[in-house]
Design a protein with these regions (language model features):
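Central hydrophobic cores of alpha-helical transmembrane segments
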Residues: 275-282
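Helical subdomain adjoining the active site within ATP-dependent kinase catalytic cores
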Residues: 293-331
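A glycine-centered beta->alpha junction motif in the catalytic cores
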Residues: 91-105, 149-155, 239, 283-302
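ATP-binding pocket architecture of kinase catalytic cores
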Residues: 42-130
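Active-site activation/catalytic loop segments of kinase-like enzymes and analogous catalytic loops
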Residues: 233-268, 282-307
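ATP-dependent phospho-/nucleotidyl transfer catalytic cores
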Residues: 53, 129-201, 257, 307-311
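Active-site acidic catalytic loop and adjacent metal/ATP-binding pocket
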Residues: 34-39, 183-234
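ATP-binding glycine-rich phosphate-binding loop
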Residues: 13-40
Length: 331
């Protein structure tokens, strides 16, 4: 006898003209959230996804709009009544194409290109419901930046013992404050206003798992569960941190490529390079590492911690020097 869950899923699929005798629910790709479905006759595969009601239907409607605009996302199907989802028991269910993966991860260059294209293509004339009640103001951005800089300052003061770690912490706190000063000088207010006028959307979770390299070599973006109206700078920062997490990576090379590629594709934000550069100056990776270790009550002075923080600090210092010159050249 079929379980309640199976009966519910088959009922959902029937709204897409897919019936129990014709389909197999092959496996659960993500526990109680994502299922792989196959048509027995055609062998076509689909992904059925469940989205919690508290996330609203925004991610689904965004996906549908991107598909309509021919952006590289999996095809999303409509029900027999031309809806993009079924609402059941506090959840939204929607059906999309299954993308056959190549088995390879997208390169960091492809990830940059993917984000830039998303920011350039996710600008729609009308708001996607639910419309946001507010949009980030310059004071909000500066306040968050100032708070993080203050945390680094506090950490530096707390371990001021005149040793190598003390020197590193002071250096990172100084860079954080310089980043804040540059951000204050930038055209941040105009950037925030423009993003609101353009109804800018952030992916919200742009990690390497949410950009697929398909078997046919196409790059496909997936999973808009955390997407929201906001500053594209948030996604840019997230990607910058992701590209620099490994201290072995060349910080300057990757930062240079990020700025060059992103703005060559998403040129509409070119007037605000100074905002992006000022934010990117902040030692984001170093900050995440030290704050994370502090929360877990890990000792920063241990040999392994000191070695990692030293390498991250070197990386952050090189990135800061490059961006300082970049900021001045942009002017």
């Amino acid at each position: 006898m079929a379980s309640k869950r199976s009966r519910l899923l088959f009922d959902i699929l029937s709204h897409y003209d897919l019936y129990g005798t014709e389909i197999d629910i092959m496996k659960e790709l993500k526990k109680e959230k994502v299922w792989l479905v196959q048509n027995k006759k055609t062998k076509e595969r689909y992904v059925l996804k469940r989205l919690s009601e508290d996330k609203t239907n925004f991610p689904i409607l965004l996906h549908s709009k991107l598909y309509q605009e021919r952006f590289h996302v999996p095809k999303i199907f409509q029900t027999k009544t031309d809806q993009y989802y079924i609402h059941r028991k506090g959840h939204y269910y929607y059906l999309m194409d299954y993308i056959v993966p190549s088995g390879m991860k997208p390169s960091f260059q492809q990830r940059i290109e993917g984000l830039a294209r998303f920011h350039a293509h996710s600008l729609f004339a009308d708001w996607i419901a639910p419309r946001p009640s507010s949009f980030l103001e310059p004071k909000d951005v500066l306040s968050a930046h100032r708070q993080k800089a203050a945390q680094l300052e506090e950490q530096a003061k707390a371990i001021d013992h005149g040793d190598a770690l003390s020197h590193i912490m002071k250096q990172m706190a100084w860079i954080a404050n310089q980043s804040y000063a540059w951000l204050e000088k930038s055209n941040l207010a105009d950037f925030c206003r423009t993003a609101k006028e353009r109804k800018a959307i952030c992916h919200g979770d742009y990690n390497s798992n949410n950009l697929l390299l398909a078997k046919n070599r196409e790059i496909m973006m997936i999973d808009f569960d955390r997407a929201y109206y906001g500053l594209p700078l948030d996604d840019f920062r997230f990607l910058l941190v992701s590209l620099m997490k490994n201290p072995k990576n060349d910080a300057v090379k990757r930062t240079r490529l990020l700025f060059a590629l992103y703005f060559s594709i998403c040129s509409l934000y070119t007037p605000y390079k100074s905002v992006y550069a000022a934010d990117a100056m902040f030692p984001h990776v170093f900050y995440s590492e030290t704050v994370g270790r502090e929360k877990q009550k890990q000792v920063l002075h241990s040999p392994s911690s000191l070695d990692l923080l030293t390498r991250l600090a070197e990386q952050e210092t090189k990135k800061f020097a490059f961006l300082s010159d970049f900021f001045k050249s942009e002017g």
